[in-house]
């Protein structure tokens, strides 16, 4: 009975780790057909972000330049000009396909992430007992650590998350999340998040040290400040 009680939380933890991957894989395959069909048959109005509009405009400017080049080389044989026109036409069709695929992927990723969040929330509520057991294990493990190890772990974690070299890591992580939700890459938004999010985390962490650690373990705070200095 004791082994069963210990096994269920571990099984629950494993399922929590692999469930998002399984949901993403399953729903991407099942929803892709329906979203593609809906976009191609019912979508009558085009919505473009500033980044997408700029990208498409640049592509059309390139095509326009090719057309101007076409006018400038009228002395070339008709077969050559015909080949050039066909190439421009194919490029235009490819541009439209890329635009449609970008929107389909954005809707697909957004739908999958919302569905995953709902399923994981329900799964967490249903597994409240297992979460309580896992939480007690974590608290017991942390309690048995020495103050020096705790201070070293906190210092290492803070340096990784909000240290001098952390902006590049935040840029990669925020860019990945931004892309995972299907949004077009935007350097201004990502740069703004990278410059503000670690600052917010740093403020929350200092408040946590002041309100929580000072109350439960003053010696840990002293060791942490000594190592940090």
UniProtKB/Swiss-Prot annotation:
Catalytic function, reaction form: K(+)(in) + H(+)(out) = K(+)(out) + H(+)(in)
Gene Ontology MF, one: proton transmembrane transporter activity
Pfam family for this entry, one: CemA
Transmembrane helix in keyword set: yes
InterPro entries from the UniProt entry: CemA
HAMAP family the UniProt entry points to: CemA_PxcA
Entry similarity comment: Belongs to the CemA family.
Name of the protein described by the UniProt record: Potassium/proton antiporter CemA
Gene: cemA
């Amino acid at each position: 009975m004791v082994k069963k009680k210990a096994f269920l939380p571990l099984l629950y933890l494993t399922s929590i780790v692999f469930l998002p991957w399984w949901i993403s894989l399953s729903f991407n395959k099942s929803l892709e057909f329906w979203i593609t069909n809906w976009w191609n048959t019912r979508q009558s109005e085009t919505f473009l972000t500033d980044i997408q509009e700029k990208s498409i405009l640049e592509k059309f400017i390139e095509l326009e330049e090719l057309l101007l080049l076409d006018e400038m080389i009228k002395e070339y044989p008709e077969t050559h000009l015909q080949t050039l026109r066909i190439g421009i036409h194919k490029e235009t069709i490819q541009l439209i396909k890329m635009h449609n695929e970008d929107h389909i992927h954005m809707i697909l990723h957004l739908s999958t992430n919302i569905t995953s969040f709902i399923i994981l929330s329900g799964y967490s509520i249903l597994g409240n007992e297992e979460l309580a057991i896992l939480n007690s294990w974590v608290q017991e493990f942390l309690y048995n650590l020495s103050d020096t190890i705790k201070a070293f772990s906190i210092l290492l974690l803070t340096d990784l998350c909000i240290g001098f070299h952390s902006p590049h890591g935040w840029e990669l992580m925020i860019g990945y999340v931004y892309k995972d939700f299907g949004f077009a890459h935007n350097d201004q938004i990502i740069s703004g998040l990278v410059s503000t999010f670690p600052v917010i985390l740093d403020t929350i962490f200092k408040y946590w040290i002041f309100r929580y650690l000072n109350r439960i373990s003053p010696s840990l705070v002293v060791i942490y400040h000594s190592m940090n200095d």
